[in-house]
Amino acid sequence: MKDLTILIQGPYFEFNEYNSNRNINILKKNFPSAKILISTWKNENKFEVKTNDKIIFNDDPGSVIDNHIGSATNGSNILRQVVSVKNGLNEINTRYTLKIRSDSYFNSNKILKLELNKFQFDKRYKIFDERIITSTIGSLNQKSTNILYNFSDWFNLGLTSDLKKIWNYTSIESDEINYETI
């Protein structure tokens, strides 16, 4: 998977010795042939953009009200994710994209070695051209939440065209992330 862009999405992250620039350097070391694109918010000026890297600054759309069962907060950053990922994907022309949060990194490139064709699936229900790899970290248990089709925002790896299908929302209002049963 040489035709790869790593899309780093979100605000600048900093905690003790960890920060987004450190994470980006680790990603560059482990994915040396990948392009780097950062999609963040206006006034996020701590990112160190190197030669051949690209950064786009988005208007921050703010949070939306989050009343779903199991939520510990009253605001969801889903709209922020959609805006930064969608705008980032629109700038990418490589075949594959690894979308990752700005507070995350991979210690190796083993994810690129997964043999996805070994897994069976029913072609009648196929939505994507290839499989998309994502994490279970941050994915909600459907038995304890009222958000349908939730998946982790930590990372997505797949065809850029397939990721565009996932992140194609135009806007999200406060209660559109919730559903209710009668």
Please give the residue ranges for each predicted region.
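N-proximal low-complexity "stem/linker" segments adjacent to membrane-targeting elements
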Residues: 1-18
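Short loop->beta transition adjacent to catalytic acidic/histidine clusters or analogous donor-positioning motifs
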Residues: 2-4, 28-38, 53
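Short, well-formed alpha-helical segments that are part of the catalytic scaffolds
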Residues: 14-30
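A short acidic (Asp/Glu
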Residues: 17-20, 47-50, 92, 108-113, ...
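Active-site-proximal specificity loops/subdomain of glycosyltransferases
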Residues: 39-91
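Short aromatic/hydrophobic "clamp" motif used to bind/position activated sugar donors
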Residues: 97
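Short acidic donor-binding/metal-coordinating loop in glycosyltransferase active sites
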Residues: 100-104
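Catalytic core and acceptor-binding pocket of nucleotide-sugar-dependent glycosyltransferases
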Residues: 106-182
